């Protein structure tokens, strides 16, 4: 029964039109397209973190092609206090990182994507100021990776459609 189930499942999947996103590995069209995306400098510490994460994710195979696209990113990094305690101190913070980005075709100047991505994280404020600052920085590092991953996903979908 199992011997029949696997080929049957393969036939059913082939009929539904699903195709692997990264077909062809590092030599496939999507991987080559991602490798041809140049990330413009992004302002600030959050910008440095997001840009590095984007560059890592866009050239995962180590292949760097001549730039065909430019990715412009504007960030909004906000840290706000929440949860007032009885002694009027803040007990919790929320760090929000939002990105507005555009993928520009360098040959034509056409904007391929104009979108936003973002994420947020909660931070406990503790009595140690050092621990709180460390938690804020860790949250920024984690959010940078999440936002970069969301941007790369949308860029991948747009390049695949082209």
Where are these regions (language model features)?
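Surface-exposed short loop/turn segments
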Residues: 61-116, 122-138
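Positively charged n-region of N-terminal signal peptides that target proteins for export
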Residues: 1-4
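C-terminal/domain-edge helix-coil "capping" segments
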Residues: 131-162
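An acidic helix/loop motif centered on a single conserved Asp/Glu
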Residues: 42-57, 147
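Post-signal peptide N-terminal segment of mature Sec-exported envelope proteins
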Residues: 25-45
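Bacterial signal peptide processing site
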Residues: 17-20
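C-terminal motif of bacterial Sec signal peptides marking the signal peptidase cleavage site
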Residues: 11-15
């Amino acid at each position: 029964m199992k011997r029949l189930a696997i080929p049957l499942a393969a036939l059913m999947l082939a009929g539904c039109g699903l195709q692997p996103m990264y077909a062809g590995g590092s030599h496939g069209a999507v991987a080559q397209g991602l490798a041809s995306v140049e990330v413009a400098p992004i302002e600030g510490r959050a910008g440095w973190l997001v840009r590095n994460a984007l560059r890592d994710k866009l050239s995962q195979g180590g292949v760097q092609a001549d730039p065909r696209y430019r990715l412009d990113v504007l960030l909004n990094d906000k840290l706000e206090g929440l949860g007032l305690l009885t002694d009027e101190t803040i007990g919790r913070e929320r760090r929000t990182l939002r990105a507005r980005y555009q993928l520009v075709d360098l040959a034509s100047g056409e904007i391929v994507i104009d979108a936003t991505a973002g994420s947020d994280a909660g931070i406990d404020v503790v009595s140690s100021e050092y621990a709180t600052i460390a938690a804020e920085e860790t949250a920024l590092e984690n959010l940078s990776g999440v936002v970069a991953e969301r941007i790369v996903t949308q860029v991948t979908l747009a390049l695949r459609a082209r």
